Amino acid sequence: MNEKFVINIGRQLGSGGRAIGEKLAAEFGISFYDKELIQIASKESGLGKEFFEKVDEKESHSFFGGLLGLRANVNSEIYGNNYLCNETFFKIQSDVIRELAEKEPCVFVGRCADYILRENPRCVNVFITANTDDRIKRIAQSHELSLEKAQTVIEKMDKKRAEYYNFYSNKVWGAAESYHLCINSSVLGIDETVAFIRRFIEQKLG
């Protein structure tokens, strides 16, 4: 494929989504961006890296934040500052994603990249899921946690990712209609899932 294109990967924690994204980038010989976006956004904005790390893919708030479980007696000044930080972060990161997509073919993991690049016809949006037991085992092993703790971490992170995505995209995180392809990596395994997605991308983009 000679034209620039972008692969956007949404994923459940423990599904192998990041590994799949990295392998796709390697196979296509294109750039891969996940946490790397934080460093780029920090450099381009002049804001500290810790600012971006603090709000990266966390649940977002608005003045209608009661929908996310915020109480009415939250201090308005603090609440407003949190809102500003989240909105500023999202805008800066969105600008970086658009600039990178314009400059080169690449893979983005998370960060609402599929929504940010929704006007780009050369995008393929993929969501990676996996069986719950496989996810728990993968996180327990990679982070040296008990199975019980790994399950708790997965539930909390999935909730945060869903809130972040749903808030900014006005779509539903993980829902089939939000993506071009949803795939369970437990069915084929990581490497065969990569091969399947690659064939799908080549077929879609031609």
Regions found by a protein language model. Give the residues of each.
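Glycine-rich phosphate-binding P-loop
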Residues: 9-22
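Small-molecule kinase domains that catalyze NTP-dependent phosphoryl transfer to phosphate-bearing small molecules
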Residues: 57, 61-67, 146-190
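Conserved phosphate-donor/acceptor-positioning beta-strand/loop module used by diverse small-molecule
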Residues: 119-142, 147-155
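Pre-Walker A (Motif I) flank of P-loop NTPase domains
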Residues: 3-12, 104
